[in-house]
Every structure is written in structure tokens, then in C-alpha cells.
UniProtKB/Swiss-Prot annotation:
Its EC number is 2.7.7.19, 2.7.7.52. Associates with the cleavage and polyadenylation specificity factor (CPSF) complex. Interacts with CPSF1 and CPSF3; the interaction is direct. Interacts with PIP5K1A. This is Speckle targeted PIP5K1A-regulated poly(A) polymerase. Binds 1 divalent cation per subunit. GO terms for cellular component: cytosol; mRNA cleavage and polyadenylation specificity factor complex; nuclear speck; nucleolus; nucleoplasm. It comes from Homo sapiens (Human). Gene3D superfamilies: 1.10.1410.10, 3.30.70.330. Widely expressed. Changing D216A: Abolishes adenylyltransferase activity. InterPro entries: MTPAP-like_central, NT_sf, Nucleotide-bd_a/b_plait_sf, PAP_assoc, RBD_domain_sf, RRM_dom, Star-PAP_RRM, Znf_C2H2_sf.
Amino acid sequence: MAAVDSDVESLPRGGFRCCLCHVTTANRPSLDAHLGGRKHRHLVELRAARKAQGLRSVFVSGFPRDVDSAQLSEYFLAFGPVASVVMDKDKGVFAIVEMGDVGAREAVLSQSQHSLGGHRLRVRPREQKEFQSPASKSPKGAAPDSHQLAKALAEAADVGAQMIKLVGLRELSEAERQLRSLVVALMQEVFTEFFPGCVVHPFGSSINSFDVHGCDLDLFLDLGDLEEPQPVPKAPESPSLDSALASPLDPQALACTPASPPDSQPPASPQDSEALDFETPSSSLAPQTPDSALASETLASPQSLPPASPLLEDREEGDLGKASELAETPKEEKAEGAAMLELVGSILRGCVPGVYRVQTVPSARRPVVKFCHRPSGLHGDVSLSNRLALHNSRFLSLCSELDGRVRPLVYTLRCWAQGRGLSGSGPLLSNYALTLLVIYFLQTRDPPVLPTVSQLTQKAGEGEQVEVDGWDCSFPRDASRLEPSINVEPLSSLLAQFFSCVSCWDLRGSLLSLREGQALPVAGGLPSNLWEGLRLGPLNLQDPFDLSHNVAANVTSRVAGRLQNCCRAAANYCRSLQYQRRSSRGRDWGLLPLLQPSSPSSLLSATPIPLPLAPFTQLTAALVQVFREALGCHIEQATKRTRSEGGGTGESSQGGTSKRLKVDGQKNCCEEGKEEQQGCAGDGGEDRVEEMVIEVGEMVQDWAMQSPGQPGDLPLTTGKHGAPGEEGQPSHAALAERGPKGHEAAQEWSQGEAGKGASLPSSASWRCALWHRVWQGRRRARRRLQQQTKEGAGGGAGTRAGWLATEAQVTQELKGLSGGEERPETEPLLSFVASVSPADRMLTVTPLQDPQGLFPDLHHFLQVFLPQAIRHLK
């Protein structure tokens, strides 16, 4: 218990922080749940194992360089069992010998002198170092420590200053950039010996001006017009001492950088050598390095590495080729490419000092050789056919030079998206796609902040006309030759506009083109030079140069919907005084609530539940029946009223704990035609807006833009009347993408609703409360009830009324099993707000009160149950 107490510290403003796992909890029950969780228990066990390992180990030096681990193991076996021997393979001057038990270690230390092969060994206890939790190894590009970030941003004068300070906290330091340049120079020198005239180009985060601590070092080995390489001698297994000394990588230069682990300089003494331990201290502000230089040697073989997935190559500009490239490549070229890739891997493995964990990935869409560089702590990859990615990186760098607001916006939105669970690998947005989305947004401002790619191509001078793989990559290299933008909007306004615009863009029904600086409608067809080969999806974002590549083709419908929901919630928050002004009561303000990581419940809140196609009035009526009759919810319809833009702050004027949670209407919807491409109309231009008022006695729990435990405005929206495709009305493209039934629904809507001249209904929202866990054991209870009534699936349950009656009986039985009767005057087990919009027929469920953490289970149940229920009631 004492060890547990030492891992936990109380926070000044309430809550607790687990120093071992770097996790903050809001209260004691949450802390107890964390301490009993798998992650914390694993780290406690790992720390105990590391401590026991240190108590059984000795530090050995003074042996000849040709002595291997087997010889050392044989010598120390005379004192007892030997568990392992870890050698310093780079310099071969020391080793750590782990004995089988503490008694064997004491026997080794009790002997005053040790000798091996005529050389006197220096043996002493292994130094005990403070345990460094692997939990601190956050994903690449992760934000600094939350306390450091909060303190730095809270001291800023305004939101714009916060965004600029965030860039300073996340970008590479000058020493880290110099370190990467030294590694590139080292690679250039080595590869020139094998491929005279080749050039090693860094690309990606290292040069596109959006670098972060710990980002990979992406390299493009440009062989130029080099024909098939001449046979080269077999690369040595490990670099010699002469080659290490002859390399341009100055060990002292590495040692002076904060990113360098302790083994970045040759040890002057055995005491210095012992700094190379199993655990290397790491920081969220420094490049992530392996656990230790020594322990990583056991993982040096490709077989010990996890299999590389082509999705991992899609994170940055490196994934810019056509999807059919590999399939169309002749087998002979594939074989030659694989052989060249193996040759590059052999050179890295045998001739570059400090490189380890080399792995060739020929099956990736862009074949690469992955590597780690121990002295610098960098992870990287080398590709042979990625010239297009190099120009993409230079284009992003040019955009950041054209306007000083680009970098703060991109850094802020990357950090926000990471906290919302929107960016990453697999079906999530890549950092490259998110950056292009920001650039497209800035191109569509009025006046524009950035020029379109077509405009840049026209201004390319002599020597800047470039064509790569048939794509025009021409643009000026010098930003000073271009006129600056006349747009002078502050950073805080641009950030709020981004959230508003993305929340109402038709992501599936249009193609966001950076080359044209506008959204091209998908349904109407596109010119062949813009359309051919491009794979459409829920989010269509065209690469600026490879026009056949949709950089967001991997994004799923659920992620695209969650992106717009999170943007809608953030846009609502950006209209509040909490975003615009520093809090006089010490509360988080400005960027801080936006950058707080979301809890699982808030991520689910932003994940919409797709519903079957049906007229909106029929859909809302069916939802009310399901919640009230089938599930036994106490349900209240939200009311609407109109207020002035500046009126009220959302706090109740009444006493007690009752709060009035407001929901601003979506007022920043894109207009049709030209204005849709320019941005969102009505930003700040309306004097009165709609809001939804829900009188509740609970607080909204950790919505997407709020810090845990902070009350605030409920970020739901009511639909507004507008043109087809806008917020509040389903676009025909959105309905058509659902297949033949979608076309029928589109016709039904046009004839049944719009044809009658009826106004479009606004979004419907309900506050629901549950007193029993009616989602648990429901299938078993239904089966038991069917057996008792002997109706089964073929009886009255097959009708609409019969299905409702059956589900109501199932709910009543589950209430009886849980014990007690429903009493509205008592506090409910769980309360939430359900909201559905006619624009997309997606249901959003937001928790209001969830003291027992049951919302994730309920949300998972509703994802399956509600669509089936609507089909029964149609």
C-alpha cells in the first residue's frame, strides 16, 4: 500500500495523478479503478521485475574486445547460475551480467579479484536507476506533459498567443534539427561510396515545417539516372572503430543535444559506460528512443520486429502513389526493386555506425527500409521512389512561409485531432491529410489566406517547372516573390471558422481540391484530368499534385461523421466567453478545454449511430416509441427559444444545483454556389440565434471540448432551414450514396416534403433517463418470454404493435430482475441526450449523468438495437 501511495499525488484543484502511469483522475473512485486496472498493475509488476533484475546484476569491464557473451557466461557460472549477459556491442568495453539469484551475485562481489584471458576484470554492483515508465513513451508527435502544457498556455495573453506558444512547445529545437542534419550527412557519405552521384533528401516532417519532437526521419535516396548498380562487396556485419571515427557525426555534438541518450559519446570510464542501462530516461518533449541501447540489441533481427503494414506508410507524404502501381509493375522490375531494397538494407546494417533494427518492407505501397539510429535516438526509413513526396513536403513548407498563421493553426488542429481520437493510422486521418484540410480551408477564406495550387503553378519561374510521374509539381520555391495575403483575421477567429466550416461541408458529396481551391461536386462529374483513378469515400480530399490520389480514402464513414460532430462541438465552444477571454476564476480557458484528451464516453458521444432511411417525422416518432415504450426511458422533448447573440452565459438564474444547458443553433453553414467554396456564411453576422434549452439537474460529462468535471454548454445543434445539402437538410448525394433505397428516399423527400412546399423540420432532441440496466441480458430475457408465451418470432411479435409489446415486456422483466420500482423522484441510473438531424439521419447520444460509467455499454447496445427497432416500426 505504501508503494501505491508513493505513486499517487493529490492535485491542488482536486483529483489525483498517478506518477507511474502519468494518468490524472477526477476523484477517488476513478483512482481506485485505475489502480486496479491492467495497465497500472502491469507497470507495477514491470517495475518490481526491473528492480529484482538490478539486484541480481553486476557491471563488468576490462575484458578484451574479442571476448563474447558466451565466454563471460562460462566464467561467471563458477559463482552460480547466469540468467543473461548483455554486451555493449558498439564499443565492446563493458557488459552487464545478470545472475540467477541474489546469492550468486553476492558470491561474485565477495571475490576481490577477477581475471579472464590474462586480463583483470573490474566487477561491481549494477547501479540502481529510477524506473522509467514505458507509459511515458507516448505516440509520435504527442503533446508535452499536460501540466507543463496547461501552465504554459494559461499564462498566454489570448488564444492567438496560446497557439503560437503551442508551436514552440511541440516543434524541434535548433539542436534537434542540427542533429538530423548530421545524420543525413552521415547517410550521404556512406551511400556515396556505393552509388556515386546519389543524393539523400530528407522529406516529411523534418523539412515541411510541421515537425514535432520524436517525429521520424524520412529519407529519399535519389539515385538519379544511375543504371543498375555494380556488384558491391558484402557489407560488414558491424561498423569498425575506424569507420565510426571517420564518420562526420561528431559524438560531442550529439552529446550536447537534449535528444541524445547517454550512449551518444564514447565512455571515458567504466562509470560513464554504466549509464547505458536497460532503461533510458525519456521525455515527451524529446524523440522517443528504445528502452535502452543494450536491451534493444536483442531486438535487432527483422524477425523480432512487428510486421509492417502498408497503412503505416500512409501517415505522411510518403503514401502518394497510385493504388495500382504495384499490381502493374512487371515481375522483373519488382524483383530488381526488392534486390535494390535489400542492398540498401545491407549497407545500413553493416556500414552506418549506430544503425540497428534494420528491416526492409518491400510489400508496402512505397517500399522502404526502416531503421533506428542509436546515437541520435531517431527512427526513420529510406525509400527509393518517392520523389513526389519530396515536392509535397516543399509545398507545405512554402505554405507555412507564405503566412505566419499557417503553422499555429496546423499545430493546434493536429493536437486537437489527436486528443479527439481523429488522427492516427488505420481508418483515421493522417497528419498529412489533416494538414491539407487546413490548407484547403485557408484557400477558401474571403479574402484567401493562401493561393491555390493552380495559381502557384502559373507563378513558377525558370528552373521551377517540374514534372514527376506525369504530374505537374511546379510552384515557386521562394515565398518572398509572392504577394502576401490581405486577409488579417486573427488566429482565434480562423480556428473557430475552421470548426464551423468543416462541420457543415458535404464531405462525401464533393471533392475538396487544393489545386482549384474549391469543392468539386461528385454527383455532377469531374473533368477527366481531375477525376480519373481517384477513389472516392466518405471524405474526399485531393492531393495537390497527384490528382488521382484521395489522401483521405482510408477514412471510414464513422470517422468522417465523428470529425464533423467534434467540429460542431468545438465550434459551439468557440462562441463562448470561456474560449474568448481569460477566466478570472482560474478555470481552463481558450485552447485548454479544446486540447484536453477525450474520455471514452465523449468519443462515443461524437460517434453517430446510422439509422435506416425514412421520412424524418416517421423516424423521430419511431425513436420516441423505442426509447419510451420499448426501453422504458423517462423522456422529455427539448424546447427551443430565441435569444440575442450576446445574452446570457448559460448559467441558471435560479438557486440550487439546477443548470440550464444551452444549445446554440448552427449558424455558420456553407452557402450554395460560389460562397460555399469561399467559406461559411454568417460568421458573427446574426444578432439572434436559436438555442435549445434543457432544464436538468446534472452536468454535461466531459464532452469533446471540455475538460473532465467542468460544466459547460451542451454542444448540440438544431437544424435550420436552408438549401439542399446544407445543415438541416439531406443532400441528394448523401442519400444516393446509400444505394437504390437512397435514391428512393431522395425522391420521397423531394415529392413528399419539398414538393409540398413544407418547411424543413429542425433537429429533434430528447433528454432521456434510465433507472435500470435494460440493455443487459435482453436477448436471454426475450428468449425466455417467447418460450413462455409460445409466440416466438412468427406470432404477434412480427407486427409493429406486437414487436413493441414484446420489447416492453422484456424491459419490465429486466426491471423486476434488477429489483425495486421506478421512482421518478429519485436520481436515475443514467441520463443522456439523443439528437437526430434530417441532414444525415444519424443519431448522436450524449451522456448527461453517468456516475457508474455505464454509457459505453449503453452506446454499444444502441448501435445494434436502434437500427433494428426502426426497421420493425417503419
